[in-house]
Every structure is written in structure tokens, then in C-alpha cells.
A protein has these predicted regions:
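N-terminal leader/targeting and pre-domain segments
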Residues: 1-12
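Local sequence-structure signature of Cys/Sec-based thiol-disulfide redox active-site neighborhoods
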Residues: 10-43
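Structured alpha-helical
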Residues: 12, 51-54, 65, 77-79
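Arginine/glycine-rich "motif VI" loop of SF2 helicases in the C-terminal RecA-like domain
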Residues: 42-46, 104
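Thiol-based oxidoreductase modules, predominantly thioredoxin-like and allied folds used
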Residues: 47-59
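Thiol/disulfide oxidoreductase modules built on the thioredoxin-like
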Residues: 64-70
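A short, hydrophobic beta-strand/beta-hairpin element that forms part of a small beta-sheet core
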Residues: 71-83
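Ser/Thr/Gly-rich flexible loops in soluble cytosolic domains mediating phosphotransfer, phosphorylation
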Residues: 89-107
Length: 107
């Protein structure tokens, strides 16, 4: 039987969140989604996130491969399980819940 190990606060390996945001560049809802996502990530994830933006107007293959038919759409790629949020991400509590940040941080 293994002994449980105690880890000092701040020394755990921090999980990086990989996010993919599908947008239609120049569209208002896509701009709002980008701003809302950046705000949420800055507040809750600090330096522990990477956002890949995909403009569906110039990259046709990626949205089809990922089954994206509406913009803006956010996909949580990692940590698994994958999650998808559609819309301009103005429902902050909904986005936090979908990204499973509520379990990590008090809101």
C-alpha cells in the first residue's frame, strides 16, 4: 500500500487548458466571443491556457473535420473530456461550468 503524498501548495504541476475558438472574422458575435474568452481565461487560468483561433471564412477544412457548423464555437481540447460551447460566450457562468473551472475556483 502506498502512503499518500503531501504536496506543498503551489508546487503541483499546473494543467494547461487548450482551447479552440471557431470564429467568422469581422462578425460582431465572433469579436464578442474572443473578448469574453480572453477575459475569462485571464481571470481564471492566468498563464495556463492556449487559444487557437480558426477563421471559418479562410480555413474550411478544420471546421468540417471538427463538425463545426455555427460560429462562434469554443472547443475545450484539453484537459479531457472535450467540451463545446456555442455562442458569444457572454454567459460567463455557463462557460466557466463547461470548462470545468467552477470545480477549481470559487466564483
Amino acid at each position: 500500500m502506498r502512503k499518500s503524498e503531501s504536496v506543498a501548495p503551489g508546487t503541483q504541476k499546473k494543467q494547461i487548458y487548450l482551447l479552440k475558438l471557431y470564429i467568422a472574422e469581422g462578425e460582431q458575435n465572433s469579436r464578442i466571443a474572443r473578448e469574453n474568452l480572453k477575459s475569462i481565461c485571464d481571470e481564471y487560468l492566468k498563464d495556463r491556457f492556449q487559444i487557437q483561433e480558426v477563421d471559418v471564412l479562410t480555413d474550411f477544412a478544420s471546421p468540417l473535420r471538427d463538425g463545426i457548423f455555427v460560429t462562434p464555437t469554443l472547443i475545450l481540447v484539453a484537459p479531457e473530456p472535450r467540451a463545446t460551447v456555442v455562442g458569444n460566450l457572454s454567459d460567463k457562468k455557463g462557460v466557466i461550468s463547461a470548462l470545468r473551472l467552477r470545480d477549481l475556483y470559487e466564483t
